[in-house]
Amino acid sequence: MKVASSSAAATAGPSCSLKAGRTAGEVVLGLSEQSVAISRCAGTRLPALLDEQQVNVLLYDMNGCYSRLKELVPTLPQNRKVSKVEILQHVIDYIRDLQLELNSESEVATAGGRGLPVRAPLSTLNGEISALAAEVRSESEYYIILLWETKATGGGCPPYFSGA
């Protein structure tokens, strides 16, 4: 990684959103000092704020993130090496595809009679579960009664099963 020398000190211009309206030592809320230092427009100050080991740790973390993205995004080609830019492009496309799919599912669900919603409402599921539980309960009660009657008749079939 090439880093500009600290002798070429350049100051951030007014287009730098992190530095605009802030004093040099002020920390931006929500970001660590290290993140702010990396994000500043004056990249020439980077070597003074981070030592080489810290830069290597950050690069290692980023490479791990790219590897994880390669695992998660199914549209990435697995048979060849892809650049970081290509990984990011596939990630953006994949997120956009997921958003479109989510929006189309919600449109189908709100359209009324045009199609069934992809997910059944919880009340419907609860009703189905209750019906199944009642069916299982009545079936198991039936077998318990059958077993009791079988024992009561001395091991033989109850009269209504004997065909008489």
UniProtKB/Swiss-Prot annotation:
State the Pfam families in the record. Answer: HLH
Supply the alphabetized keyword list.
Biological rhythms, Cytoplasm, Developmental protein, Nucleus, Phosphoprotein, Repressor, Transcription, Transcription regulation
Q: Does the keyword Transcription apply?
A: yes
Please provide one cellular component term from the Gene Ontology annotations of this protein. centrosome
Q: Which InterPro entries did the record assign?
A: bHLH_dom (IPR011598), DNA-bd_prot-inh (IPR026052), HLH_DNA-bd_sf (IPR036638)
Where in the cell? Cytoplasm; Nucleus
SMART domains recorded for this chain? HLH
What Gene Ontology molecular function terms does this protein carry?
A: identical protein binding; proteasome binding; protein dimerization activity; transcription corepressor activity; transcription regulator inhibitor activity
Q: Record keywords: Iron included?
A: no
Q: Where is this motif: Nuclear export signal?
A: 91-104
- Spell out the post-translational modification annotation for this entry: Phosphorylated in vitro by PKA and PKC.
PROSITE patterns xrefs: BHLH (PS50888)
Function noted in UniProt: Transcriptional regulator (lacking a basic DNA binding domain) which negatively regulates the basic helix-loop-helix (bHLH) transcription factors by forming heterodimers and inhibiting their DNA binding and transcriptional activity. Implicated in regulating a variety of cellular processes, including cellular growth, senescence, differentiation, apoptosis, angiogenesis, and neoplastic transformation. Inhibits skeletal muscle and cardiac myocyte differentiation. Regulates the circadian clock by repressing the transcriptional activator activity of the CLOCK-BMAL1 heterodimer.
Read off the PANTHER family from this record: DNA-BINDING PROTEIN INHIBITOR, DNA-BINDING PROTEIN INHIBITOR ID-1
Q: Kindly provide the name given to this protein in its UniProt entry.
A: DNA-binding protein inhibitor ID-1
Question: What organism does the record attribute this protein to?
Answer: Rattus norvegicus (Rat)
